[in-house]
């Protein structure tokens, strides 16, 4: 596709021709004055000069217009799509920036963390007696983010339908050892059956009193291992420590040894034993016959395990055993993600380790400027004292966005009230609300110290904004906010035996528009971890070294996917007889970030979009044709008119687009596009104009040969063949006059030059030159050309094109050689006639109202009588003035010819 710069060059050539024409006119006028023509003719001549100058200005304006048309039009399609939170499960209905014909509801359902069992540590077997540990099942949580359903009515929360992701867990009947929070992950929700819940906690059984002696000096620990050293505590992550131990010498009932944990680690996880004397029972260490070898407890405050031997050891020697205990993060002492020292002391022997906590970020929500964002974590559950309390931390607007009409709902259930033991009411729930000064200082572990200077308590400001209107739901009206808040929840759960499940939801709108409704939710549930140990001894006098068990795999095995149960409702099974030994405990947390997002909203925006049509633009494809341009020569012009139709379309802008297609030259077809604006493509035709230039060939004036030509000139278009002219370029000079016609063809111009030779005959043509015509031609042609091309383009653009063509005309001018002809001015050229029709057709497309300097201008001057100005008296100065004008014109003419000669050289 030719670049528009060709047309600009042609415009410049055209302008040169006109200057030359002005010089020629000056010579003629000067000569006329010299020979004694009256002053009133001189004034009329000046008027003609003004007209010529006006034409020049119009030519410049045409060039400017073509520049404007050629300026690439960047049609930016704003594809406003609904925000979809990839890893948050939300129903996000977002208003697009432009009205859309339909509202798109994008609902992303996340998947839950797979459930898996922590690998069991193989019990150590002695060659004489196998001391078997009371192995405990370690179920992994099956938590997930919620499958949130968008709702525009806050009241619907009470219907339990907006968030669906019930999660229950398989927990063994024995006492819970530790509980860990299961946070929402990115996998689809699953249901697992719950056979027991945190509510059915065994009463604490006091361990054997450590009345004897500390025998750490007689106990040797070995084969210490951590199951893993990196995990995410916010995703119910934890590790296990395992060690073998042997007792040297005799020990008796009541003797004990200890193990101590570092600050960054805890043995109770998220289970709260503050109401149970800060003591957590540990599973007994038993032998193969289920005889208790030692009892154990864990002191929450000192983080110390105490293993107290029973009567079983009184007559035993070579006592050896092993234990495996779960370890968790200490959320207060390790508040941020990172690597911490985890040096564990067992029987006064230090085992140095490091543990890395990769907390899932608590800053979660819909990824858009006014998206709801909230998360929570259950950080303490009392499973032992019978008070059935729990503590929960909620981060509201952790992304610190500017939100309008913000509501937060804290629920004691997730999907169905009857599936959770949570109790949320004015009597069962205490809420404390804090404003965060610096969000970056929030902990990753969800630990929040009420005495922290970064937190400012504002609970009193919300006294009238906290309601319990819906069953098992606390509603908090935050209104318009731009800060982050922490809500500390102290709640209760009942004794129904169901799992404790909670959910928090935030909903808000864009404060600027009152629209763009967004909702995001987060689920929490608790998971139990178990630990225990085994030991034995023998009565043989000759001790035997214990055979160490296989080493613990430090890397956890991949989590198996839980089998989704078709039964949505958990079926709690009756609790079996409680076992006499106190069982380990649990670590609770669970959280699943269910994002309920749903921008649902607003989008209702009436999507008027009728705009869809715009698509039609696509036609622009026609561009490809552009090549066809070449054809344009075929003068398919006839079609040209067809363009007009395309104009009809959308015209205005469409055109602009059409510009793009210029290629469509292939044109006429492109017309079809016209409808779709695609026409705009046609504009691109302007390039096609270039073809039109081939028309210009007509200039080739080859006709010129025919001399008759001049008129034929008009036909000359048919000459388009003239292309052949191109050859003769050398001639360029000879009178390309005919050019005038050729004008139109600007491109051919180059050829025309060649023709011009033939012209030499054509001088006669010079008549035809009627340079003035040429001007007109330029316009006209442009049009005509354009037509032809445009025709092809028919694309509405044609108009624009016509302009562009005009450029092409300019080329023809380039034939400037025609200058020589310039004299002939006779204008007789019928050519001018040819163009005017096109000009007339194209006139409406002239957006700036420029005057097309076509043959019509020349005719007007020829037919209108010169005004009677001045008097008829002879003025002697006229002769002198005429001579000067003639001389000046001659100089201008000579200078121009010299320049032309240099350029051709």
Curated annotation (Swiss-Prot):
GO terms for cellular component: extracellular region. PANTHER family: TOL-PAL SYSTEM PROTEIN TOLA (PTHR34403:SF8). The keyword Secreted applies. NCBIfam families: LPXTG_anchor (TIGR01167), MSCRAMM_ClfB (NF033845), YSIRK_signal (TIGR01168). Transmembrane segments: none annotated. It is found in: Secreted, Cell wall. Residues 1-44 form the signal peptide. It is a peptidoglycan-anchor. Gene3D superfamilies: 2.60.40.1280, 2.60.40.1290. A motif (YSIRK-G/S signaling motif) lies at residues 15-26. GO terms for biological process: cell adhesion. Residues 44-61, 68-101, 134-189, 833-844 have a biased composition (Polar residues). The gene is clfB. Residues 44-191, 530-877 are annotated as: Disordered. Residues 556-829 have a biased composition (Acidic residues). Proteolytically cleaved by aureolysin (aur). This cleavage leads to the inactivation of ClfB. Residues 861-874 have a biased composition (Basic and acidic residues). This is Clumping factor B. InterPro entries: Adhesin_Fg-bd_dom_2 (IPR011266), Adhesion_dom_sf (IPR008966), Fibrogen-bd_dom1 (IPR011252), LPXTG_anchor (IPR019931), SDr-like (IPR050972), SDR_Ig (IPR041171), YSIRK_signal_dom (IPR005877). Residues 45-542 are annotated as: Ligand binding A region. Residues 102-119 have a biased composition (Low complexity).
């Amino acid at each position: 596709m030719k670049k528009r710069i060709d047309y600009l060059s042609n415009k410049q050539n055209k302008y040169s021709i006109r200057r030359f024409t002005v010089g020629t006119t000056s010579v003629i006028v000067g000569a006329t004055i010299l020979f004694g023509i009256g002053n009133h003719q001189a004034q009329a001549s000046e008027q003609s000069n003004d007209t010529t100058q006006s034409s020049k200005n119009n030519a410049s304006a045409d060039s400017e217009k073509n520049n404007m048309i050629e300026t690439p039009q960047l049609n930016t399609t704003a594809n406003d799509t609904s925000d979809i939170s990839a890893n948050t499960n939300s129903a996000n209905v977002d208003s697009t920036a432009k009205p859309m014909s339909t509202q798109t509801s994008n609902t992303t359902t996340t998947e839950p963390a797979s459930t898996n069992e922590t690998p069991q540590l193989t019990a150590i077997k002695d060659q004489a007696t196998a001391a078997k540990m009371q192995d405990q099942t370690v179920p992994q949580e099956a938590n997930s983010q919620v499958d949130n359903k968008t709702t525009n009515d806050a009241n619907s929360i009470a219907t339990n339908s907006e968030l669906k992701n019930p999660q229950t867990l398989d927990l063994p009947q024995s006492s819970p050892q530790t509980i860990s929070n299961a946070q929402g992950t990115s996998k689809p929700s699953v249901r697992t059956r719950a056979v027991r819940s945190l509510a059915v906690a065994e009463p604490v059984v006091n361990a054997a009193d450590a009345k004897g002696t500390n025998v750490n000096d007689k106990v040797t620990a070995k084969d210490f291992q951590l199951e893993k050293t990196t995990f995410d505590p916010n995703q119910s992550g934890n590790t296990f420590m395992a060690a073998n131990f042997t007792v040297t010498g005799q020990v008796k009932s009541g003797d004990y040894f200890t193990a101590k944990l570092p600050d960054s680690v805890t043995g109770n996880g998220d289970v709260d034993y503050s109401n149970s004397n800060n003591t957590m029972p540990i599973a007994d260490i038993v032998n193969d016959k289920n005889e208790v070898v030692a009892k154990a407890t864990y002191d929450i405050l000192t983080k110390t395990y105490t293993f107290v031997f029973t009567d079983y050891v009184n007559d035993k020697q070579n006592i050896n055993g092993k234990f495996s205990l779960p370890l968790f993060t200490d959320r207060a002492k390790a508040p941020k993600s990172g690597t911490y020292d985890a040096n564990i002391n067992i029987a006064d022997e230090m085992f140095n380790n490091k543990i890395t906590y990769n907390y899932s970020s608590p800053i979660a929500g819909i990824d858009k400027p006014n998206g709801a964002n909230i998360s929570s974590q259950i950080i303490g559950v009392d499973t032992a004292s019978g008070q059935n309390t729990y503590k929960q931390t909620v981060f509201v607007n952790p992304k610190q966005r500017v939100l309008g009409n913000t509501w937060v709902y804290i629920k004691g259930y997730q999907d169905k009230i009857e599936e959770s033991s949570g109790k949320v009411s004015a009597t069962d729930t205490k809420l404390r609300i804090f404003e965060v000064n610096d969000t970056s200082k929030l902990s990753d572990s969800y630990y929040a110290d009420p005495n922290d200077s970064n937190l400012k308590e504002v609970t009193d400001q919300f006294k009238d904004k906290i309601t319990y209107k819906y069953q098992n739901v606390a509603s908090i009206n935050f209104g318009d906010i731009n800060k982050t808040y922490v809500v500390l929840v102290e709640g209760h759960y009942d004794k129904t035996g169901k799992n404790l499940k909670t959910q928090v939801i935030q909903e808000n709108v864009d404060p600027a528009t009152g629209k763009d409704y967004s909702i995001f939710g987060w689920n929490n549930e608790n998971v139990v971890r178990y630990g225990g140990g085994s030991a034995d001894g023998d009565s043989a006098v000759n001790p035997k070294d214990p055979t160490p068990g296989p080493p613990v795999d430090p890397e956890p095995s991949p989590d198996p996917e839980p089998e989704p149960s078709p039964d949505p409702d958990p079926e709690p099974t009756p609790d079996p007889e409680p076992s006499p030994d106190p069982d380990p405990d649990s670590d609770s947390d669970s959280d699943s970030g269910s994002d309920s997002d749903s921008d649902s909203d607003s989008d209702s925006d009436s999507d008027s979009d009728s705009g869809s049509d715009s698509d039609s633009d696509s036609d622009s494809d026609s561009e490809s044709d552009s090549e066809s341009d070449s054809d344009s020569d075929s003068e398919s012009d006839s079609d040209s008119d067809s363009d007009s139709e395309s104009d009809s379309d959308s015209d205005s802008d469409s055109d602009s687009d059409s510009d793009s297609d210029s290629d469509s030259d292939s044109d006429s077809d492109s017309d079809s596009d016209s409808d779709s604006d695609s026409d705009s493509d046609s504009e691109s035709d302007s390039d096609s104009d270039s073809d039109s230039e081939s028309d210009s060939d007509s200039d080739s004036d080859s006709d010129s040969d025919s001399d008759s030509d001049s008129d034929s000139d008009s036909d000359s278009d048919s000459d388009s063949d003239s292309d052949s002219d191109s050859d003769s370029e050398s001639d360029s000079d000879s009178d390309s006059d005919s050019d005038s016609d050729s004008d139109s063809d600007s491109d051919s111009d180059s050829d025309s030059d060649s023709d011009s030779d033939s012209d030499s005959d054509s001088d006669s043509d010079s008549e035809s030159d009627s340079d003035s015509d040429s001007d007109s031609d330029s316009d006209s042609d442009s049009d005509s050309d354009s037509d032809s091309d445009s025709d092809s383009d028919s694309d509405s653009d044609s108009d624009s094109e016509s302009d562009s063509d005009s450029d092409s005309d300019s080329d023809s001018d380039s034939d400037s050689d025609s200058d020589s002809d310039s004299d002939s001015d006779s204008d007789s050229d019928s050519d001018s006639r040819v163009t005017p029709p096109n000009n007339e057709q194209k006139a409406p497309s002239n957006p700036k109202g420029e005057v097309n300097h076509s043959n019509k201008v020349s005719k007007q001057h020829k037919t209108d009588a010169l005004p009677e100005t001045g008097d008829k008296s002879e003025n002697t100065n006229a002769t002198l003035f005429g001579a000067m004008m003639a001389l000046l014109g001659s100089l201008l003419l000579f200078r121009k010819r010299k320049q032309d000669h240099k350029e051709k050289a």
